[in-house]
């Protein structure tokens, strides 16, 4: 038989089984013994002359001071920056700052904690969560009640050690009233600061920096100026335009009583004419002539048009008559040709005999009679040699 298959185990089952050992390394470290370590605070101190002494000045000193065990805070927070205690004020308001409060704490709970002598309680509340932010201010009646409340610092309140200190007074931001006054400077400007190079102070041969404004080799030096007005302001010129004194054109005395100075000025500086000395021209007569010419032309055009129309109408009936006569002549010629073709065969022999016996007078008479007979029947005889 083959080897047995090993059973599979999930990761959670492996981690949860204590037979394989502890998986939390922090628990192993907590079991090891540890020596207490002293916490120290550092202070940085710089000599006042190190900023202007150059490279030869001693550098700043770094001191490490071991904090005494009495200055350590209670509650496992360790030692931190020790702020100077604010003295108890001698005048009201006597306000204490209370910190490290529970977020579920109310003003009534805080009043019960301090007891009597409390005038007002103000908890700082978060506007989003509408819960306490963990600190507040309590105002007392006298300085003695405030000092008694400071003795309660470190006491347990709802599972937290309370931290009580004297509240700092409100800072007064006194600003100048700039809405009133005449905005006039009282006195000269303060002296200007010496100009500095964009690369900082210059270094001399002695190894120290010097101010470039104090260098005697500098060419440009700024002298202090005092912006003080010497005397009153000049009067302002009127912004209004002078009014024009117009005189009537019909006054004849203006030209006669003209002063010689005025004549000299006008003669020396003649006025410019924008039209170049041109005079107005009367164009009415020219326009009338042009209109008459145009009327004559239109009349002549109308006459020629009417004559052309009359000629075209008179030519049409004569042409129609000529066409009709041409058609009738052609028809009569065809008919005569047919008749002549039939009669030539029958009377060829008789015609020759009659022609020999007939005289010229007798030949004309039957011809006329034959023509009249044909006209009565509606036929006309046309000779063979006629061409159309």
UniProtKB/Swiss-Prot annotation:
The modification Phosphothreonine is found at residue 61. It is found in: Cytoplasm. Its main location: cytoplasm. Residues 18-84, 171-388 are annotated as: Disordered. PROSITE patterns: RRM (PS50102). Keywords: Cytoplasm, Phosphoprotein, RNA-binding. Gene3D superfamilies: 3.30.70.330. Residues 171-185, 208-229, 289-349 have a biased composition (Basic and acidic residues). It holds the Pfam family RRM_1. One of its GO terms (cellular component) is nucleolus. InterPro entries: EIF-4B_RRM, Nucleotide-bd_a/b_plait_sf, RBD_domain_sf, RRM_dom. Residues 38-50, 248-257 have a biased composition (Polar residues). PANTHER family: EUKARYOTIC TRANSLATION INITIATION FACTOR 4B/4H, EUKARYOTIC TRANSLATION INITIATION FACTOR 4H. This is Probable RNA-binding protein sce3. It comes from Schizosaccharomyces pombe (strain 972 / ATCC 24843) (Fission yeast). The gene is sce3.
